[in-house]
Amino acid sequence: MAQLRWGRKGVRSQRRKYSRPVAYKPPSSKVVSHVETVLNKKDVTGAEMKPFNDGSRYSMKKIMVSATLTMAPGELLNYLIVKSNSPIANWSSSFSNPSLMVKESVQDTVTILRRGKLESSGTAGKDVTKSFSRFVNLGLGISQTQHLYLIIYSSDAMKITLETRMYIDV
């Protein structure tokens, strides 16, 4: 339960004479992770976004995902940001191949938070660098028992640099 501070201050203005109660917020921190990898052609892959590996207590309230890709012209990248109550072991058995729809076997445990796609354009023979950045509010938050994943389908082999900034309440 949030604590309220009811301190009465002097007259501030004609419309709002006294201060309103201020809800107490727990201290938050930012955790940054950086991953570089190569995606395979026509393959569903994923990465778990987790601030700590040691199992310390935390609650993740929001996350910023930034990715930079080097891809050939005319290629496609679909991505999902999902929340799951249980770990996902096999990406291709949980999500359909080009469209990244959640398969029936894991529908009860997976919640889609955000989705998007990147398409490259340019002249043939030259690689194109594309990037995306997504800021996701997680509502009540994700505790250390839940899992947050970035699921990616790429139409061709491409190099990705993934950076996440997680805002957590410790």
Swiss-Prot record:
Signal is among the record's keywords: no
Biased composition regions of type Basic residues, renumbered to the chain: 1-19
Record InterPro entries: Nanovirus_coat
Residue numbers spanned by region Disordered: 1-25
This protein's GO CC annotations: T=1 icosahedral viral capsid
Pfam families for the chain: Nanovirus_coat
Location(s), subcellular: Virion
Transmembrane segments: none
Keywords associated with the record: Capsid protein, T=1 icosahedral capsid protein, Virion
Family membership: Belongs to the nanoviridae capsid protein family.
Protein name per Swiss-Prot or TrEMBL: Capsid protein
